[in-house]
C-alpha cells in the first residue's frame, strides 16, 4: 500500500470506529431513559397475559389506571401518599412523596412513573392526573361564568345546545 492509501485507510477506520462508539453510547443512554407503559393488570399478569412479559423489580415504568376509592392514605407528618391503582383487573400499590396534582382524587385516572420496588408496588417519582376533553380549570370556569352571565348565556349553553338553538327547534315544530 502506498502512503496516501494507508493514510486514507487509517482515516476511514478512525471515522467508522468513532461513529460506532458514539452510536453505542447513544443507545446506552436511550436505554436508560426508556419507561415502558403498563396497566396495573399487565404489571401483575404480564402483557397479553404472558408472565414472561412482566416488568422486573427495579425497572422504571409508567403505569396508568384509576385510583381505587377508599385506598388513599396520606402521612400527616410528610407528603407521603399511598394508594391503589387498577384498571379492570387487579390493583397495584403506588407510593409517592410529593405534592399531588390538583386533579388527583379517588376514582380519577392517573399515570404514575417510577420504579417497581416489589412485584405489585411502584415507588413513583411523578404522578400525572388525567382529565376528559370537557375539563375546564375551576378558575377559568368561574371567569367564564362571570363573563357569560351578563351576555345572557347560561351554563347549559356552554355544554351543548344554546338557547338560540332551542328556540330554532321550537320554531321549526
Swiss-Prot record:
Residues 152-173 are annotated as: Disordered. Heme binds at residues 131, 135. Heme chaperone required for the biogenesis of c-type cytochromes. Transiently binds heme delivered by CcmC and transfers the heme to apo-cytochromes in a process facilitated by CcmF and CcmH. Residues 1-8 are cytoplasmic. HAMAP family: CcmE. One of its GO terms (molecular function) is heme binding. Keywords: Cell inner membrane, Cell membrane, Cytochrome c-type biogenesis, Heme, Iron, Membrane, Metal-binding, Signal-anchor, Transmembrane, Transmembrane helix. The keyword Cell membrane applies. The chain crosses the membrane at residues 9-29. It comes from Haemophilus influenzae (strain ATCC 51907 / DSM 11121 / KW20 / Rd). The keyword rRNA-binding does not apply. GO terms for cellular component: plasma membrane. GO terms for biological process: cytochrome complex assembly. It comes from the Bacteria. Residues 156-173 have a biased composition (Basic and acidic residues). It is found in: Cell inner membrane. Its main location: membrane. This is Cytochrome c-type biogenesis protein CcmE. Belongs to the CcmE/CycJ family. It is a single-pass type II membrane protein. Residues 30-173 are periplasmic.
